[in-house]
Amino acid sequence: MSFKLWREGRSFSYSWKGTKEVPAIKPNCGIKVLYEPHNPIVDLVFVHGITGHRDHTWSADRNSDPWPKLMLPSRIPEARILTFGYDASVIGFWRSISRNSIGDHSNNLLSALSSFRSNAELRPIIFIAHSLGGLVVKDALLSSRASPEPHLRRILDCVRALLFLGTPHYGADLADIGQRLVKLAGLTTAKTNRKIIGVLQRDSEVLFRIQKGFQELLRSQQKDGTRTLEITCCYEELPLMGMSEIVPSESAVLHGYPAIGIHADHRGIARFASADDPGFVSVLGELRRWIGQVVPTDDELEKEVGAVKRKRSNNRWANRKRGGKSCGDTGAITIWGNVTRSVITNGDQIIQGNLVFGGSRA
């Protein structure tokens, strides 16, 4: 990678060519909705990687919309599509950059997602993560598991599947590239984030902690007989600018889980220009398969009933404290959940099960 490329503020996951104009930087932090159907049954959450952007990482061209926004709504209309952004810059010549660690970014993801889903706390989640974003997602799930806060623990309970795109589970050459950039920056006044670079080293203690904790999480799910996570790992088949693969398959693939090779380099593995792209076809196939499995189980419906009862009880108590009527006094019908497996409240009555609207069965 050239000094000129990084001096001009180019994103690792955007472009390695040093001849294009640099567009104005768009907002990148937090959650952004790319598509929201009337009655979603699942949240797809996209998380970019090192020096990435919540829009540009997923865009075949800098001036185009992200492919999840362009190509998924017509093919997976029942899914809400979200993208999460964070400052994962390694070096900044003309601007300040975040000094956040992986743990900071993962906690921000967990908190932002929990807050954003406050009205849909039980909706299933599928993560699609590129590069470093996969480590952020895994660490967020570990934080969710260990959190004393119910609303944060609930995130892990809702996660159904993880799709990793070039995630360096066991380290990557990204670290070597980053170290060279940091040394280069030492000759200038550039700002650097060594915390991000350090985690990508193959002997990184942080990387070891995340991977060890994640494997323990998967084993505990299998041992407890709870719903286990569906996982697919995609790896790059092409080198980047004549180099070796940035994240080779032996680092990008978790042992014992399905692996898919995508005929692209580390940048292109997250960008699809058309619906005919073989990489997109593979990713779409996995998403459709998982979404077909997200219909709530009986145990999950029982949990949903409990959540509805608690919410109704809290609302009734708050209304009576204010001297008003409770929700149960209105006689109105409220539907919680999706039309396939739902929970309906009518006054003090709660109905759960399969619902066929416009038919004779409820």
Question: Which residues fall in each region the model found?
Answer:
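Post-His helix in hydrolase/transferase enzymes
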Residues: 271-287
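Long, low-complexity intrinsically disordered regions enriched in small/polar
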Residues: 3-21, 309-362
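Active-site-adjacent alpha-helix of alpha/beta-hydrolase-fold enzymes
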Residues: 222, 237-265
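Short coil/turn segments at secondary-structure boundaries
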Residues: 56-62, 94-98, 139-143, 174-180, ...
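Conserved beta-strand elements of beta-rich interaction domains across eukaryotes
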Residues: 50-52, 86-91, 132-134, 142, ...
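Serine-dependent carboxylesterase/thioesterase catalytic core
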Residues: 48, 91, 101-215
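Conserved alpha/beta-hydrolase
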Residues: 74-90
